[in-house]
A protein has these predicted regions:
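Extended, histidine- and acidic-residue-enriched regions that form the cofactor-binding/catalytic faces
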Residues: 144-181
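N-terminal glycine-rich phosphate/adenylate-binding segment common to multiple enzyme folds
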Residues: 36-82, 150-164
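Short, flexible loop segments at boundaries between secondary-structure elements
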Residues: 94, 131-132, 172-194
Length: 194
């Protein structure tokens, strides 16, 4: 990943969140979490993408659901969850309200742009996928259900099947897991006959 092999000081210097700028929450290799500046991460992802292409990678999947608008590959097939998920979720839920769980609050204008494919504006709640236990996730899922959500989307690659099961048990609603959707769509796109 972009932050691999960087010290905490280097991460803070190069990727530290800036006031009034979009942030992301990410998990480091040691299991700790850190908030980072989204635009700085996008620059780092672009650099990493070029390195991967130079190393011969022909397919690159971004393992983050954050919005990246400027990523460009020279020849690799670039798969970006933020471009797949809105259209896929919009097509799946149709005229139903989606409750979106995410690790950090997203500014309203950014959320509107990202989820414009949905027929009904979504409701949103914050729950870290990196917290111990499932209490935050289940509380957020209940809040979304109370707000009228007919289905839930866990909009971060950090959410796991355990989180999905906890939210589904708590609410009885269908729960879409971003990592699962991205993996299935990517697998379908890359299938080659034996």
């Amino acid at each position: 990943g972009v932050l691999d092999r960087l010290s905490d000081a280097d991460i803070a210097l190069q990727f530290g969140p800036r006031p009034r700028e979009q942030r992301m929450l990410t998990r480091l290799l040691d299991g700790s979490t850190v908030e980072v500046d989204a635009r700085a991460v996008e620059t780092g992802v672009q650099r990493k993408l070029l390195e991967l292409e130079d190393a011969g990678c022909t397919v690159v999947v971004v393992l983050c659901t954050g919005v990246f608008r400027g990523l460009r590959s020279r020849r690799a097939w670039l798969i970006e969850p933020d471009r797949i998920l809105p259209a896929l979720v919009g097509g799946l839920v149709g005229p139903r309200r989606v409750g979106i769980l995410s690790p950090l609050e997203m500014p309203i204008d950014a959320a509107r742009r990202k989820w414009a494919a949905l027929q009904i504006p979504p409701s949103a709640a914050v729950a870290s996928p990196y917290a111990a236990g499932d209490d935050g996730v289940t509380a957020a899922a209940r809040d979304l259900q109370r707000s009228g959500a007919n289905a839930l989307l866990m909009d971060c690659i950090g959410y796991t099947e355990r989180h999905r099961a906890a939210a589904a048990r708590t609410t009885g609603l269908p729960v879409l897991l971003a990592s699962d959707l991205v993996a299935r769509v990517t697998g379908a796109c890359l299938y080659k006959a034996p």
